[in-house]
Design a protein with these regions (language model features):
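Intrinsically disordered, low-complexity, mixed-charge
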Residues: 1-90
Length: 90
């Protein structure tokens, strides 16, 4: 079953390579979507794929790369629409 999820991650998540870390994890899991910095200092991610792949992806990004400090990790289920191909850094 395909599912899409939106993640809002706060803490020390910008300037530590988090977007590249998230992209690498998403590509490993075969997910499609994107990751971007938000003006308020958070990171926003939209990922679409199989539930098992999303859960594995979440385990990685809930901690982030070395140097990151995740203080809040918000997950919202969304409808999968298949619009994204690959996983992009925005």
């Amino acid at each position: 079953m395909r599912l899409a999820r939106r993640y809002l991650i706060s803490g020390r998540v910008q300037g530590v390579g988090f977007r590249f870390f998230a992209q690498a994890a998403a590509v490993r899991e075969g997910l499609h979507g994107w990751v971007r910095n938000v003006a308020d200092g958070r990171l926003e991610v939209r990922a679409e794929g199989d539930i098992e792949a999303l859960e594995c992806f979440e385990r990685h990004i809930s901690h982030g790369p070395p140097g990151a400090v995740v203080e809040d990790f918000d997950v919202t289920d969304m409808g999968a629409d298949g619009r994204d191909t690959g996983f992009m850094i925005r």
